Amino acid sequence: MKLLISFLMIFQMICTNVEFYGKSYIVYDSLNQYVVEGRNIDYLQSVASISKIMTAIVVIENSRLDKKITVDETINKAYGSCVYIHIKDQITIQDLLYGLMLRSGNDCALMLAKSVGGSVDRFVEMMNEKARDIGMKQTHFSNPSGLDEEDEGNLSTVKEMAMLYRYCCQNPLFNQIVKTKEYKRLDGKGYWHNKNRLLKEYPYCVGGKTGYTKKAKRTLITRAIKKQVDLIIVTFNCGNDFEFHQKKYEECFKNYEKLVLFDKGVRNIKGNWYLFENDLLMSKEKDESVSYLIHNEEMFIYRNQTYIKK
């Protein structure tokens, strides 16, 4: 018998002792796909270079890593953070992706967009199509880099950027790129260090992306996993963002734990047989009680007798 289990977004205040000095933030439970806590989670603003998360996943899903492209005059429009590739250089999609995500190369963003979309404008359409597919209803992308000096930039919220990052983390190649601390170009012409310093400073950090423009200020997404508790934090305009992320993770990991509701396999529940294709996991506060009710082949899960998801 098939059991329908789908996750709903909820808002709960769980970890609240770390002071936040910024515009908006979210702590997002990647496993259960809900909001642990946050502030101004639906506030819409330019998100700067964390936009490149969407750029990366669109490229990964629509191109081959080993494809070589010839750099053309498209990069003449690049400014700000760049890895300084040159016209007529031949470079792989793989190298461009690492330059995009580790060094936030705006030149990489433009060349990837041109290669995958045929034009930068068509690639931006692909970014917005993917946003709709993921359920990012407020988000709108104007370019593949996150620059916002010539227009309002790429607009999103901490909640929707967390949703995007969670989606991307289902892709093994994306995870491999964002957790890489140092990368040597395949052609040997460059050696790049990841700007996400939490990868070196915090052992449970497994990826993320930095961002900054004068308009957006600092933007940061990180992900950390400890004892299978999988959290994503997004901050906008937070001056001490790396410190805040690390302290918030430690606070949440102290109060949070993974619970296995049902192991993978065939299970008899109150006289009916159900097949669980994977372990059914959820995260909860350590002093929380969790219960469930099965009705019409749907499972309703309760925390402290409060319905949270089905």
List each language-model region with its residue ranges.
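Sec-dependent N-terminal signal peptides
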Residues: 3-13
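Generic structural signal for well-ordered beta-strand positions
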Residues: 35-37, 291, 308
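Cysteine-rich modules of extracellular adhesion/ECM and protease-associated proteins
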Residues: 294-296
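N-terminal secretion targeting segments of exported proteins
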Residues: 1-3, 310
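Active-site-adjacent loops and short helices of periplasmic peptidoglycan-processing enzymes
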Residues: 14-172
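Domain-terminus/edge residues, biased toward the C-terminal soluble/receptor-binding domains
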Residues: 136-137, 152-263, 267-278, 284, ...
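Short linear loop/turn motifs
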Residues: 145-147, 289-292
